Each structure stands twice: as structure tokens, then as C-alpha cells.
From Swiss-Prot:
Protein name (record): Phosphoribosyl-AMP cyclohydrolase
Function: Catalyzes the hydrolysis of the adenine ring of phosphoribosyl-AMP.
Entry-linked PANTHER family: HISTIDINE BIOSYNTHESIS BIFUNCTIONAL PROTEIN, HISTIDINE BIOSYNTHESIS BIFUNCTIONAL PROTEIN HIS7
GO molecular function, a single term: zinc ion binding
Cofactors required: Mg(2+); Zn(2+)
Binding annotation for Mg(2+): D80, D82, D84
One Gene Ontology term, aspect cellular component: cytoplasm
Length: 109
């Protein structure tokens, strides 16, 4: 299926143009992070095979790893049954979390 048709099936309207995106290590299946994608960031992710997200606080797109070198190389992208959440299986280089931890989910509640 071509890229534009795949993107069109995603329901960006439920959350005002954004969609929650879970990133998981493609080998270990460890959950690395959750971020939000816009249609534009999903298109950029599909085009260059690294993760692009939408920063709600900065109101801009960002490429994971562009500053830190901790890129996420996309291996597979899945969408849930409601077409409103994305799961990305990726090869993580270095830490996924801005704190320097491998995963953003390193604390117990």
C-alpha cells in the first residue's frame, strides 16, 4: 500500500490532529516511550525511516536523535483497531528518554 493511503487510514481528528505513538524496541519488545505524531510527522517518519514527533509544548516537529544522536530507526509500524494509536517497533540507538535512561518508563508508581 502506498504511503499516502496508509496515512489516510489514521484517525487524527479524535485528538485535534495528533495521535499517541508508542515506541517499542523491535528485538526485546521493551516499551521505550510515548509521544504524539501529527500527519506531517508520520509522513516524515515514513519517508526517512527515523521517528518524527510533534512537540505539544514547543508546537513544532522534532526528529528523535537529531540533537542527542539517539536515533530510532523504524523497523515496523502498526496501527490499533480504532485507527487512533500507532505502535512503532524501532532500533533504538542509545537512550530513548531525555533523562539518559534507555526507556522513559524506568520509575515505579
Amino acid at each position: 500500500m502506498e504511503i499516502c493511503k496508509r496515512v489516510e487510514q489514521v484517525d487524527f481528528e479524535k485528538m485535534n490532529g495528533l495521535i499517541p505513538t508508542i515506541v517499542q524496541d523491535y528485538k526485546t519488545k521493551e516499551v521505550l516511550m510515548l509521544a504524539y505524531m501529527s500527519k506531517e510527522s508520520l509522513n516524515k517518519t515514513l519517508e526517512d525511516n527515523t521517528t518524527w514527533f510533534y512537540s505539544r509544548s514547543r508546537d513544532e516537529l522534532w526528529n528523535k536523535g537529531a540533537t542527542s544522536g539517539h536515533f530510532q530507526y523504524v523497523k515496523e509500524i502498526k496501527i490499533d483497531c480504532d485507527n487512533d494509536t500507532i505502535l512503532i517497533l524501532a532500533e533504538q540507538v542509545g537512550a530513548a528518554c531525555h533523562t539518559g535512561n534507555r526507556t522513559c518508563f524506568y520509575r515505579d508508581l
